[in-house]
């Protein structure tokens, strides 16, 4: 408890950071069990790979960024491959802004699950489209993981291409290896570009800052914003982008998620700079 209090004192709360709603996003990782979802998340957050397998029920992470004079919040939701609660999966999809669908190249069942997941995402998001009367783009990448193994492939390239489609701005495919850290950076860059988010959110394009320096988020952002307004180009390179992994991040409550969805589905409702992220 003392450790938690110390870290809380060192790092401002989400409300103290005052991040505009337009700068808050959620990345959702979906797929069957044992395909490497958690390994991909671990690479994204820490750069490390854990070989031991531990079944995931649902893991929630939060990361803050200071990029080009702006502060961003990215929530990362690592979902269960067993989906014991369909309603929770639907809620995760409704609140997601960008998606990573993962299958194992040596497991056809996991590929067929990704086929179902992609359709479920499109169907679920179409509800928002029908209510808002606006186009709802769904930035989505499909990952064929475990490309480092010498195995017999159970999925043909033709099937993958058919699933992905011919519009790289809506869906892209990457053959990756979380174990070897192969093609992951390219995948994250493509996903953030698809979502029109700063490329510096990719783990290879920003500096990672320890939690005790959390207070520099706004100081650095304000400094860069002043430089940008002055036309000096401050904050324009990746050296001025950095991110902090929030300790003890908690998944927002169901009520908070439902309020967030309600806000998104309200006709003409758009995130404004004065609006703040929903804090559970």
Swiss-Prot record:
Record GO biological process: negative regulation of DNA-templated transcription; nitric oxide mediated signal transduction
Protein modification: S-nitrosylation stimulates guanine-nucleotide exchange activity.
Lipidation positions, renumbered (S-farnesyl cysteine): 277
Tissues showing expression: Expressed in brain, heart, kidney and liver.
Keywords of this entry: Cell membrane, Cytoplasm, GTP-binding, Lipoprotein, Membrane, Methylation, Nucleotide-binding, Nucleus, Prenylation, S-nitrosylation
UniProt: GTP binding residues: 31-38, 78-82, 145-148
Subcellular localization, as worded in the UniProt entry: Cell membrane; Cytoplasm, Perinuclear region; Nucleus
Family matches, as SMART domains: RAB, RAN, RAS, RHO
Main location: membrane
CDD domains: Rhes_like
Gene3D superfamilies reported for this sequence: P-loop containing nucleotide triphosphate hydrolases (3.40.50.300)
General function of this protein: Small GTPase. Negatively regulates the transcription regulation activity of the APBB1/FE65-APP complex via its interaction with APBB1/FE65.
Assembly behavior: Component of a complex, at least composed of APBB1, RASD1/DEXRAS1 and APP. Interacts with APBB1/FE65. Forms a ternary complex with CAPON and NOS1.
Protein name, entry field: Dexamethasone-induced Ras-related protein 1
Protein species of origin: Mus musculus (Mouse)
Gene that encodes the chain: Rasd1
